[in-house]
């Protein structure tokens, strides 16, 4: 009889206690996060006098970012504070890890300070899993991006954005364009889209920037930008992750833009009501033209806004589930 492995993200009852990856989560769990996030959108409403709810009052949330981040770290901090948590942002460059202390020693010391939740971004794939294996049962871990592996909250906020504008996934064609090989966002988006029943997921990019096995994930692969964009409902652009590249995978940024940059002419090949997304940071003139990034079909800034509600939902859900 084959051995089965428990999902480390779930309690014995199948509830979400950590968010480490979208892979392995059910449609019901993803939908629950999106539905809960919808309820939190009103908390961030500009007309609301007090933008707080007491869900995490008395809880301590540690943001541990071992890689630089602006949007993700800031939106996690805002999300935790709107849930009334105490938030501690650890300055990793000045911390003991830069002096040789191991990752688990750091976690154990912070746990001794009564941490209730760790939000972790790390250059090593699997680091949040390692932390989740070693924390106390009442402590929760959220992956804010680990190496090339996963960025589950970005994937969820992308799904929230798509659902907000398109309502239903079952008739959608979504194109993910660019450096998919090095993109943890692309992996999370693909798993989320297929789990939520998206009709067709496309990957567009040069052969050097597309990983093997995409077809086995149910993804249609295109190397020609124009062909890949025909009739799509959603375009998700990705930046070139030069910091993760080894060797010359591309001739130049200018040549890349000529072949794969999203211009208004190329966007016209998609459906007239197609939306344009980007997880940021954008490289204008490399993967996207400013006229498109700032155009009427762009929902890029809305993604950032929705990210707060989605991260509030994730934190609120995991905090309520213990073995």
Swiss-Prot record:
Q: Which domain of life is it from?
A: Bacteria
Q: Which Gene Ontology BP terms does the record give? A: 'de novo' pyrimidine nucleobase biosynthetic process; 'de novo' UMP biosynthetic process; amino acid metabolic process
One GO CC term of this entry? cytosol
So what EC number does this one have?
Answer: 2.1.3.2
Pathway entry: Pyrimidine metabolism; UMP biosynthesis via de novo pathway; (S)-dihydroorotate from bicarbonate: step 2/3
Q: What are the recorded GO MF terms, alphabetically?
A: amino acid binding; aspartate carbamoyltransferase activity
Q: Which PANTHER family match?
A: ASPARTATE CARBAMOYLTRANSFERASE, ORNITHINE CARBAMOYLTRANSFERASE, MITOCHONDRIAL
Q: What are the binding positions for carbamoyl phosphate in this chain?
A: 71-72, 121, 151, 154, 280-281
Task: State the family named in the UniProt similarity comment for this chain.
Answer: Belongs to the aspartate/ornithine carbamoyltransferase superfamily. ATCase family.
Q: What class of enzyme is it?
A: transferase
Name the Pfam families on file.
Answer: OTCace, OTCace_N
Q: From the UniProt record, list the reaction(s) this protein catalyses.
A: carbamoyl phosphate + L-aspartate = N-carbamoyl-L-aspartate + phosphate + H(+)
| Residues that, per the record, bind L-aspartate | 99, 184, 239
Q: Output this protein's name.
A: Aspartate carbamoyltransferase catalytic subunit
Coiled-coil intervals, chain numbering: none
Q: Which UniProt keywords apply?
A: Pyrimidine biosynthesis, Transferase
Stored InterPro entries: Asp/Orn_carbamoyltranf_P-bd, Asp/Orn_carbamoylTrfase, Asp/Orn_carbamoylTrfase_sf, Asp_carbamoyltransf, Asp_carbamoyltransf_Asp/Orn-bd
């Amino acid at each position: 009889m084959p051995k089965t492995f428990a999902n480390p993200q779930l309690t014995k009852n199948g509830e979400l206690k950590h968010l480490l990856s979208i892979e392995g989560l059910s449609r019901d769990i993803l939908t629950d996060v999106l539905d809960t996030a919808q309820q939190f959108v009103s908390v961030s409403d500009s007309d609301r006098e007090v933008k707080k709810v007491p869900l995490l009052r008395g809880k301590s949330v540690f943001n541990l970012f071992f890689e630089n981040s602006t949007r993700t770290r800031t939106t996690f901090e805002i999300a935790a504070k709107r849930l009334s948590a105490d938030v501690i942002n650890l300055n990793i460059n000045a911390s003991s890890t830069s002096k040789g202390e191991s990752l688990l020693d750091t976690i154990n010391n912070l746990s001794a300070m009564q941490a209730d939740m760790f939000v972790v971004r790390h250059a090593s794939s699997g680091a949040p899993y390692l932390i989740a294996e070693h924390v106390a049962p009442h402590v929760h871990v959220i992956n804010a991006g680990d190496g090339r592996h996963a960025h589950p909250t970005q994937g969820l906020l992308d799904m929230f954005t798509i659902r907000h504008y398109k309502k239903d996934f079952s008739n959608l064609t979504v194109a993910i364009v660019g450096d998919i090989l090095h993109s943890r966002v692309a992996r999370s988006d693909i798993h989320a889209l297929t789990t939520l029943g998206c009709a067709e997921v496309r990957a567009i990019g040069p052969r050097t920037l597309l990983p093997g096995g995409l077809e086995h994930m149910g993804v249609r692969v295109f190397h020609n930008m124009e062909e890949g964009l025909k009739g799509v409902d959603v375009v998700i652009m990705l930046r070139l992750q030069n910091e993760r590249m080894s060797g010359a995978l591309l001739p130049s940024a200018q040549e890349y833009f000529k072949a794969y940059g999203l211009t208004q002419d190329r966007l016209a090949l998609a459906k007239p009501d197609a939306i344009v997304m980007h997880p940021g940071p954008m490289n204008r003139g490399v993967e996207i033209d400013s006229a498109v990034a700032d155009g009427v079909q762009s929902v890029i800034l809305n993604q950032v806004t929705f990210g707060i509600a989605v991260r509030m939902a994730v934190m609120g859900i995991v905090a309520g589930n213990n073995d």
